[in-house]
Swiss-Prot record:
Molecular function GO labels: allantoinase activity; dihydroorotase activity; zinc ion binding
CDD domains the UniProt entry points to: DHOase_IIa (cd01317)
A Gene Ontology term for the protein's cellular component: cytoplasm
PANTHER family with a match to the protein in the record: ALLANTOINASE (PTHR43668:SF2)
GO BP terms: 'de novo' UMP biosynthetic process; purine nucleobase catabolic process
Reaction(s) catalysed (UniProt annotation): (S)-dihydroorotate + H2O = N-carbamoyl-L-aspartate + H(+)
Record's keyword annotation contains Isomerase: no
Name the record gives this protein: Dihydroorotase
Cofactor(s) this protein requires: Zn(2+)
Species lineage: Bacteria, Pseudomonadati, Pseudomonadota, Alphaproteobacteria, Rickettsiales
Organism: Wolbachia sp. subsp. Drosophila simulans (strain wRi)
C-alpha cells in the first residue's frame, strides 16, 4: 500500500477544474444518496448530480469506481500537542493522521504548553496551521487563565476561537462557569465542558467498579461526570442564547440529564468518542495503560447507553479526543500513566461498525461525523453543496482491514484497537479542492 500526502497551504489553485465521475455521492444532511458525478473548481464544489456532464474543459478527471464520495469528516476534539509537547504530536503529524482517516477539519483543544489563553498564542497556532497542516485547523481557546480568571473571550473569538473549554480539566468554580456561560451567550459560541467533579475523581485511574477493585486501583466514580453535567445545566437553564456542550460523554446518568435538558428546549449538545461506544472497562485487564483515558471506559450498560444515545439523537456527534502520548508516558503502572489514546485513523471504521452491524443507518452514522459537528461550532462545512468548500473523501465502505498502530501517520501509537478487524477505508481525502491524501494498493 502506497500513501501520499500534500500540505493544504492555500488549497487548490484558482480555476482548476476536477471532475469526480462514477461515484456514489452521499450528503448526510440532505439524505442524498445517488450514483453520479461531481465537479469542483478551485476550492469550491460547483456542480453535482446523476447526469454525466461533459468532462471537456476539465483539468483532471478522477474515476471513483463506484466508491462513496461524501463530505470530509469533522473532528471537534483533538490534541495536537503543539506548542510544548512536540515529541508526542505536532500539527504536521496530527494533520497527516487526520488526512489518512478522512478528517478534513479538526478542532484543537487549548491545553497545550503554554495553553491557548491569549491572542498571541491563538495567532501562533493559526500561523503554524497555515504553514504545516494538511487539513483545516480550528481551535477552542481556554475559558480560564492560570490565575483562574476568565480569559479575554471576545478578543480570542476575534482571533479565531470557535468556542471555549478548559478540556483536560473541568471548570470547578460554579461562579466562573456561570460567568463564562453568560459571556459566551453574547459571543454566540459554545462553552465546552470536560465534565468531571475532581472532588469525586481525584487520584483515580480507571472506572470505579469491578475492574478497579480486581486490580486494586483507585477508580473514577461515574457520578463525577453526571454531577458536573447536572450542575452546569442548572447554571445555564435560565440564560438566553447560551450553548453548553459536553465533551466526551461516557455515562448513562449523564445522558439521562442531557435528554432532560433537551426535552426542556435547552441548547445542550454533546459528543461521544468511538472508544466509549465500542469498548468497556474490561479491556483494561488486557491492555493496561494503553486503555487508560479520561473519562475512563465504563460498564457495558454505559456503552449500550452511548449507542442508544447516538440512535435517538441525544448524542449529537462523534469526536475522537485524539490524545497522543509517547511510549514512556504509557509504559508505566496504571496509576502513573498518562490518560488518552489516538483516534483519528480509526474514527471512521469504528463508527461504521454501527452501520455494518445494523444498529444505525448509514446516513445517520455519517451525519454524526460531518454536518452535525460542523453545526456545533458554526462552520459551513460537512456538506455537499454548490459553492461550499470542496472538502471531500472517497471511501470504500466494505474494504476489510486490520488496524496496525505501527502504520499510523500519527507520531504516537497509543491505541487499544491494534489488531482489531474493521470495515471501511479512506482512499482519497480532498481539502479545499486539493487532494491532500491518497492511498493505492
Amino acid at each position: 500500500m502506497t500513501q501520499t500526502w500534500n500540505l493544504l497551504q492555500t488549497g487548490q489553485k484558482e480555476g482548476y477544474k476536477i471532475a469526480y465521475t462514477n461515484a456514489r455521492i452521499i450528503d448526510p444532511e440532505t439524505k442524498l444518496d445517488i450514483k453520479g458525478s461531481l465537479l469542483t473548481e478551485g476550492d469550491k464544489i460547483v456542480d453535482f448530480g446523476e447526469s454525466l456532464f461533459s468532462t471537456s474543459g476539465v483539468d483532471e478527471t478522477i474515476d471513483c469506481k463506484g466508491l462513496v464520495l461524501m463530505p470530509g469528516l469533522i473532528d471537534i476534539h483533538v490534541h495536537f500537542r503543539e506548542p510544548g509537547q512536540e515529541h508526542k504530536e505536532t500539527i504536521y503529524t496530527g494533520s497527516k493522521s487526520a488526512a489518512a482517516g478522512g478528517v478534513t477539519t479538526v478542532v484543537c483543544q487549548p491545553n497545550t504548553i503554554p495553553a491557548i489563553d491569549s491572542v498571541v498564542l491563538a495567532k501562533y497556532l493559526k500561523y503554524r496551521a497555515l504553514e504545516t497542516s494538511h487539513v483545516n485547523v480550528e481551535f477552542y481557546a481556554k475559558i480560564t487563565t492560570l490565575e483562574e480568571k476568565l480569559t479575554e473571550m471576545a478578543l480570542l473569538k476575534e482571533a479565531g476561537a470557535v468556542g471555549f473549554t478548559d478540556d483536560g480539566m473541568p471548570v470547578m468554580n460554579p461562579m466562573i462557569m456561570r460567568q463564562a456561560l453568560l459571556y459566551s451567550s453574547m459571543l454566540g459560541v459554545p462553552i465546552a465542558q470536560h465534565a468531571e467533579d475532581l472532588n469525586l475523581s481525584a487520584g483515580g485511574a480507571i472506572n470505579e467498579g469491578k475492574i478497579s477493585e480486581e486490580l486494586g486501583v483507585k477508580g473514577i466514580l461515574s457520578a463525577s461526570e453526571s454531577v458536573m453535567v447536572n450542575r452546569d445545566i442548572l447554571l445555564m437553564k435560565d440564560m438566553e442564547n447560551v450553548h453548553y456542550h459536553i465533551l466526551h460523554v461516557s455515562s448513562k446518568d449523564s445522558l439521562d440529564a442531557i435528554k432532560r435538558a433537551k426535552d426542556l428546549g435547552l441548547n445542550v449538545t454533546c459528543e461521544v468518542t468511538p472508544h466509549h461506544f465500542t469498548l468497556t472497562e474490561d479491556i483494561v485487564k488486557q491492555h493496561g495503560a494503553i486503555a487508560k483515558m479520561n473519562p475512563p471506559l465504563r460498564t457495558e450498560e454505559d456503552r449500550l447507553a452511548m449507542v442508544e444515545g447516538l440512535k435517538t439523537g441525544v448524542i449529537d456527534c462523534i469526536a475522537t479526543d485524539h490524545a497522543p502520548h509517547d511510549r514512556s508516558s504509557k509504559d508505566l503502572p496504571l496509576e502513573n500513566a498518562a490518560f488518552g489514546i489516538v483516534g483519528l485513523e480509526t474514527m471512521l471504521p469504528l463508527s461504521l461498525e454501527l452501520y455494518h452491524s445494523g444498529q444505525m443507518g448509514l446516513l445517520d452514522v455519517l451525519a454524526k461525523l460531518t454536518y452535525k459537528p460542523a453545526d456545533i461550532i458554526h462552520i459551513p462545512r460537512g456538506r455537499i453543496q454548490k459553492n461550499l468548500a470542496a472538502d471531500l473523501i472517497l471511501v470504500d465502505l466494505n474494504h476489510e482491514w486490520e488496524i496496525k498502530t505501527d502504520n499510523f501517520a500519527s507520531k504516537s501509537k497509543n491505541s487499544p484497537f491494534d489488531g482489531r478487524k474493521v470495515k471501511g477505508h479512506v482512499v482519497r481525502t480532498v481539502v479545499s479542492g486539493k487532494t491532500i491524501y491518497s492511498q493505492k494498493s
